């Protein structure tokens, strides 16, 4: 069996799809379906079982027998960068992850987990997987950084695979449940489909992010699992592309609309990463050599998927 926490979310459900494509269907999905709309991300996938995340944690703490577990992909977390309830964030993203990590180490189960580029904070260069480059801007980024530090301390003695991925700006199929936290590409498509002009923050040609297509993220996860590589790795494309380029790709697909520029919100000032760019030195040195989709390629693919599945 393979366990995927956050399996009904964007990255988790795409990992399940990639596993299905490789013939794996004995999959336990762990999630919180209080937001029932997330079921749609699993509707076309083949899984063996589902557990609520609270019930799963109780089972882990009680050391219940899950049989032969081949891997745990831990994608479940509160991923809202605008959530400021620190206790909730630390319980969800830090304590829960520690419990699951220790269960995996005890049972010699490969543990692959979601970290985040939010650990780097507001820097504009050197997004490198080392302590001196980490200074998060929000409690979400802090919770991810703290767990990475915990993992770093454990790695030298770990007898089974422990692998973290610092996801950069992930977008693609199965993110419709995320609301305001969905990608710019998702929101632009919705606006264009509704006959509206797509909206960007003023200055978006200068805001550059490392946008990575979610299928590429799933590919990275499965390659590292199959090759039993441990460590903490950036998961981005190694390119910084502007929000303007995302909008241009959406407009090209829809063949309509003009961009409207709206003022940058005061509440995000000083808490917003204006630039991200994954340093892929460690990822490539580990042996992952597949290319990553550009924004033009990924957004075109995503627009086709969104409008095919509307």
Swiss-Prot record:
Q: Which family does it belong to?
A: Belongs to the NAD(P)-dependent epimerase/dehydratase family. HldD subfamily.
**What does the subunit comment say?**
Homopentamer.
Q: Entry's Pfam families?
A: Epimerase
Q: Which Gene3D superfamilies match?
A: NAD(P)-binding Rossmann-like Domain, UDP-galactose 4-epimerase, domain 1
Q: Which GO terms describe its molecular function?
A: ADP-glyceromanno-heptose 6-epimerase activity; NADP binding
What's this protein's name? ADP-L-glycero-D-manno-heptose-6-epimerase
Active site positions: 140 (proton acceptor), 178 (proton acceptor)
Tell whether NADP is among the UniProt keywords: yes
Q: What is its EC number?
A: 5.1.3.20
Record note on domains: Contains a large N-terminal NADP-binding domain, and a smaller C-terminal substrate-binding domain.
**Family annotation (InterPro entries):** Epimerase_deHydtase, Heptose_epim, NAD(P)-bd_dom_sf
Fetch the PANTHER family from UniProt: ADP-L-GLYCERO-D-MANNO-HEPTOSE-6-EPIMERASE, NUCLEOSIDE-DIPHOSPHATE-SUGAR EPIMERASE
